[in-house]
Every structure is written in C-alpha cells, then in structure tokens.
Amino acid sequence: MELILLEKVANLGNLGDKVKVKAGYGRNFLLPFGKATVANAANLAAFEERRAELEKAAADKKASAESRAAQLAELEVTITATAGDEGKLFGSIGTHDIADALTASGVEVAKAEVRLPNGTIRQVGEYDVAVHLHSDVEATVRVVVVAA
C-alpha cells in the first residue's frame, strides 16, 4: 500500500514522503489517525497545494516543543511518597505521577511523553527522567523522590 505522509512518523519518514507500508499498518494506524493519505493522483495534487500549510504546522509544533523543553530543563520536581526505613517506597512513582507533578509546576506534560525505560521508581532518591516532547525534541528533568 502506497501512502503520502502528512506528518513525521517515527521509523517511517517525514512530511510529504511517499512510502510503501503493509496494508494493515496503513488501514489500522496511519489512515485513521490522519498521519497519511492514499497515494493517488488526486491526493498527490491536493497534498502539494497544502504542503506549505502542513510544513508550517509541523514547524510550529516543533517550536512549541522546543520552548517546553527549555522550560523543563530548568525544572527540578520533588515528589513525596510514603516509604519504609530503608528508602523503599510503599507503591511506586510512575509516568502519571511525574506528568502530574510537572503540570502542577507550570509546564503542561502528558503521561505518554514521560519515559521511564527502567520501569517505575520504587526507591527514594534523585532521578533523571526523559520527557519526549516531539520526535526531534527530548528534555531531561530531575525528579527528587522524598519520604513523607
């Protein structure tokens, strides 16, 4: 199935690329989420007319992500949680908790943007957490977990 990408898609291509993908990936993900359109003559012509508009929208998204990354780079978030004597938390700190703490400190962050590659945080301490704001923009935030 040949498609024209309407936005940058990770591990596939950039805006305007003509790509060949499996039918299921195209029908079940790219087309329903508006990330691509079928590559036929009519859609190619329509895309070329809208190309400047789509590129401007993509540039605006990236610029806003970069400004949020600059704000996040300056932040250090403290999260309090109940913990035992040895610093082991009763429960854990996950992406949702970190996203809520960042949003409360003034920078809007979605749960899906927070990356914890080693799983949830289960110990008291300081952690560097990656926040994936855009396919090209990633910020690191210092998260301090203290016992309540």
UniProtKB/Swiss-Prot annotation:
Keywords (A to Z) from UniProt: Ribonucleoprotein, Ribosomal protein, RNA-binding, rRNA-binding
Molecular function, one GO term: rRNA binding
InterPro entries on file: Ribosomal_bL9, Ribosomal_bL9/RNase_H1_N, Ribosomal_bL9_bac/chp, Ribosomal_bL9_C, Ribosomal_bL9_C_sf, Ribosomal_bL9_N, Ribosomal_bL9_N_sf
Recorded superkingdom: Bacteria
GO cellular component: ribonucleoprotein complex; ribosome
Family affiliation: Belongs to the bacterial ribosomal protein bL9 family.
Annotated protein name in UniProt: Large ribosomal subunit protein bL9
Species of the source: Pseudomonas putida (strain ATCC 47054 / DSM 6125 / CFBP 8728 / NCIMB 11950 / KT2440)
